[in-house]
From Swiss-Prot:
Name of protein: 3-hydroxyacyl-[acyl-carrier-protein] dehydratase FabZ
GO BP annotation list: fatty acid biosynthetic process; lipid A biosynthetic process
Lineage: Bacteria, Pseudomonadati, Pseudomonadota, Betaproteobacteria, Burkholderiales
Domain of life: Bacteria
Cellular location(s): Cytoplasm
Gene this chain is encoded by: fabZ
Keyword Metal-binding: no
Species in which this protein is naturally found: Bordetella petrii (strain ATCC BAA-461 / DSM 12804 / CCUG 43448)
One cellular component term from this protein's GO annotations in UniProt: membrane
Length: 151
């Protein structure tokens, strides 16, 4: 199942400049998600990282993988919205074994591949990787917490 930017924005609270997923190519319920981020020279972080040699910060590549994981968690088996995203927070609470293999530069298309390792109502663990042109540029184990915003 695919998600366009409208469906992504229904599920994630992130907005420019922190929305780092442009399209979801596939979701296999309970298993995995594949999404993309088109990296443009117009990204605000390129202004200072680095002006004469623009490179996407690794922390933002990791955030893009975490946003893909959140989209996976907020999408039910039929492709619908699993919960009210306005009343639910999805926090990145752990990053293990993060590796950055090569720079991501303007013009690249990040392919975000996230596999579920453990899913529960409160904590989810994932194996994530980002690829450009079929080559792994980053990978990490992610742990995310799902919290209700209603007190």
């Amino acid at each position: 199942m695919e998600l366009d930017i409208k469906a992504i924005m229904e599920r994630l609270p992130h907005r420019y400049p922190m929305l780092l997923v442009d399209r979801v190519l596939d979701i296999v319920p309970g298993k995995s998600i594949v999404a993309i981020k088109n990296v443009s020279i117009n990204e605000p972080f390129f202004e200072g990282h680095f002006p004469h040699h623009p490179v996407m910060p690794g922390v933002l590549i990791t955030e893009a993988m975490a946003q893909a994981a959140a989209l996976f968690s907020f999408t039910d088996d039929d492709g619908g919205l699993k919960c009210d995203s306005a009343k639910t927070a999805y926090y990145l609470v752990g990053i293990d074994e993060a590796r950055f293999r090569r720079p991501v530069v303007p013009g690249d298309q990040l392919r975000l591949e996230v596999q579920a390792e453990r899913l529960s109502r409160a904590i989810c663990k994932y194996q994530a990787r980002a690829l450009v042109d079929g080559q792994i540029v980053a990978e990490a184990k992610l742990m995310c917490a799902i919290r209700s915003l209603e007190a």
